[in-house]
Amino acid sequence: MRAAYLQFAPTYLDVAANLEAVDAQIRSLDADLIVLPELFTSGYFFHSEEHLAHVAEPIPEGSSTAALRDWAVSLDATLVAGLPEREGERFYNSAVVVQPTGTTFTYRKVHLFYEENTLFEPGDLGFRVFDVTTRDGIPYRLGVMVCLDWYFPEAARTLALKGADVIAHPSNLVLPHCPDSMPVRARENHVFTITANRHGEEEKEGETLTFIGMSEVCDP
């Protein structure tokens, strides 16, 4: 199978601009599996709950999932991408898996980082593994974790024990340790991993977060 990630710098709170930026790049990719960063439609460093509410969407009914579905169908690829999810009055830092058939699955980030727990609920769906196929019809099992989930060895181990062959890892990494650790996660669990990080900077109340990029694909 062929796998790819798309690394870019999302514009804070501009969903339309971020979808356009991805659309301009993703259509040139030729891969069975494409992974996008965490919160790719919204940016990360939310100034308030009102800002988050402005960009959060239901999954799979939201417009961003619809865009992902369009790309998955037109590219004949499975996509994994991070989105701010709204369910009623609750918000989750989620990843959506979209297949070329249009079928969607959701994972909600379990291990929240820094100030995320002031806005998002911890994920309540557990670590999930999904049955997918390559465009040649070869089946494989796809696990998903989001950003800081990498820090806890049990996350990748749980996915591996559930039968994952590949772990997709949408991220917004600001600390330098993950790129060194993901090869270990792949090796110790005998899985392939794909970390799709973003780059750029975001500011809030005089504090700046610098996202490190350094997306990577690791083998066992």
Across the structure, where does each feature detected by a protein language model lie?
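Extreme N-terminal starter segment of soluble prokaryotic enzymes
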Residues: 1-5
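Cys-nucleophile CN-hydrolase/nitrilase-fold catalytic domain and related Cys-dependent amidase chemistry
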Residues: 24-100, 106, 175-189
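Residue-level recognition of beta-strand->loop/alpha-helix junctions
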Residues: 7-9, 37, 108, 197
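N-terminal phosphate-binding loop and adjacent alpha-helix
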Residues: 7-25
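Short Pro/Gly-enriched beta-strand edge/turn motifs at strand-loop
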Residues: 78-82, 108-115, 196-200
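Active-site catalytic loop in hydrolytic enzyme cores
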Residues: 57, 86-162, 171, 177-184, ...
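CN hydrolase (nitrilase-like) catalytic-core segments centered on the catalytic cysteine
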Residues: 63-78, 151-220
